[in-house]
Swiss-Prot record:
SUPFAM superfamilies named in the record: FAD/NAD(P)-binding domain (SSF51905), FAD/NAD-linked reductases, dimerisation (C-terminal) domain (SSF55424)
Protein name: Soluble pyridine nucleotide transhydrogenase
GO cellular component, one term: cytosol
EC number: 1.6.1.1
């Protein structure tokens, strides 16, 4: 068996693995990555972030066509099958894989396609798909194997009418009705997508409200627009069992209700991909969700083994995962840029989309911070009136005495882009983080960015 020597070996080529590998390679280290799939990119590129967002964009264009009065004058509404809409996502995946493969080649990072397993803390055996088993010895190892959907044992996921968030992208038809169990980020995003395709959707939420980590006003807006689009939301509901037939599924609820639909999408939680890694051989333990614990340098209990991305749990965002991997690589060799990633913007790609950074009103109230609120409704901005994307708002939370920005919350078209302006000002040191930036800055007109000036004026007028 061939043994190859590296400074760093990274398990996984998703955002966290890519961030760690690229950072280590640019620091002059010899790096290898191990990918369990046949292509680089991880679940983010093939099963999660990229295909679902490409799918969402296609559905959003269909909705725009079917609701724009100008198009209604020249033809009837058009509806597309789920597989046809999915073709667009597949084209994006191919481009992403090609680009990322080039990045690894350009940085002279060796790629091993196969499954890696620890022999000891410095040795990993890779059962490659082409050349058979090989041994990789490394001074440092990064576990960035990501996560997978949680699949309870009492649901038959092999049934053709039952899907998880990984398998839903293989759906070969457009169901007339769909039960989505789990109203987290993934559940809400897919509820928007299928609702936009004309599917009758029931969204089952085991909690008492949607996305409770968001600001209450944003959550209320999301709930309203999902219902306005035809989604039936059921809060505080859990299931007892799922009955399957050739024509659909029946979900028996703990409350006694019975729900019937053509298909079921179960997306209630995720588990870390840590099984079959041989972690027992290095005495590395995982929690009940298969996730690894790390310190503020992304180091695990084993000195030379680090972890990043979904496999360590919160915040389970592709954007944060890349930075976590980069920080882990920096910490390995004492390089700058190894700060623990804590303040990250949240992007939720419902229709309309949501993004936020910083504190919510509930958090500031609990902390007894004297804050004030500034709002700008998109319907009052010229750009939104021009584009027809008038649904939504920008909300700024700031300290009423120092005018320091404390939170930015956005709901509506381009929310995940708009939030970064506020994030940039919030990251400024000292008195440079101030609401006055928006009051004194000239914004292009007409733009969505000018909502910051409108919201700042709205909030500043409340200060006395």
């Amino acid at each position: 068996m061939t043994t190859r020597h590296y400074d760093v070996v990274v398990l996984g080529t998703g955002p966290a693995g890519e961030g760690a590998a690229m950072s280590a390679a640019k620091a002059g280290k010899r790096v290898a990555v191990i990918e369990a799939s046949s292509q680089v990119g991880g679940s983010c590129t093939h099963l999660g972030t990229i295909p679902s967002k490409a799918l969402r964009h296609a559905v959003k264009e269909i909705i725009a066509f079917n609701t724009n009065p100008m198009f209604r004058d020249i033809g009837e509404p058009r509806w597309f099958s789920f597989p046809k809409v999915l073709d667009r996502a597949n084209r994006v995946i191919d481009k992403q894989v090609m680009g990322r493969t080039e990045y690894y080649a350009r940085n002279r990072i060796d790629i091993y396609f196969g499954r890696g397993k620890f022999k000891d803390a410095n040795t990993i055996e890779v059962n490659t798909y082409e050349k058979g088993p090989e041994l990789l010895e490394a001074k440092k190892v990064v576990i960035a194997t990501g996560s997978r959907p949680y699949r309870p044992a009492n649901i038959d996921f092999s049934h053709p009418r039952i899907y998880c968030s990984d398998t839903i992208l293989s759906l070969s038809h457009t169901p007339r009705s769909l039960i989505i169990y789990g109203a987290g980020v993934i559940g809400c995003e897919y509820a928007s997508i299928f609702c936009g395709l004309g599917v009758r959707v029931e969204l089952i939420n085991p909690a008492k409200k949607l996305l409770s980590f968001l600001d209450d006003e944003i959550t209320d807006a999301l709930s309203y627009h999902l219902r306005d689009g035809g989604v039936l939301i059921r809060h505080n509901e859990t299931y007892d069992s799922v009955e399957t037939t050739e024509r659909g599924v029946v979900m028996h609820m703990a409350s006694g209700k019975k729900l019937r639909a053509d298909a079921l999408l179960f997306c209630n939680g995720r588990s870390g991909n840590t099984d079959n890694l041989g972690l027992e051989s290095i005495n590395l333990e995982v929690n009940s969700r298969g996730q690894l614990a790390v310190n503020d340098t992304y180091q695990t209990q084993v000195e030379n083994v680090y972890a990043a991305g979904d496999v360590i749990g919160w915040p389970s965002l592709a954007s944060a995962a890349y930075d976590q991997g980069r920080a882990a690589a920096a910490n390995m060799f004492g390089a700058p840029g190894g700060e623990f990633i804590s303040e990250v913007p949240t992007g939720i790609y419902t229709i309309p989309e949501i993004s936020s950074v910083g504190k919510t009103e509930a958090e500031l109230t609990a902390e007894k911070v004297p804050y004030e609120v500034g709002r700008a409704f998109f319907k009052n901005t010229a750009r939104a009136q021009i584009t027809g994307e008038a649904v939504g708002m920008l909300k700024i939370l700031f300290h009423r005495e120092s005018l320091e920005l404390l939170g930015i919350h956005c709901f509506g078209d381009q929310a995940s882009e708009i939030v970064h302006i506020g994030q940039a000002i919030m990251k400024q040191p000292g008195k440079q983080n101030t609401l006055k930036y928006f009051l004194n800055t000239t914004f292009n007109y007409p733009t969505m960015a000018e909502a910051y000036r409108v919201a700042a004026l709205n909030g500043f007028n409340r200060v006395f």
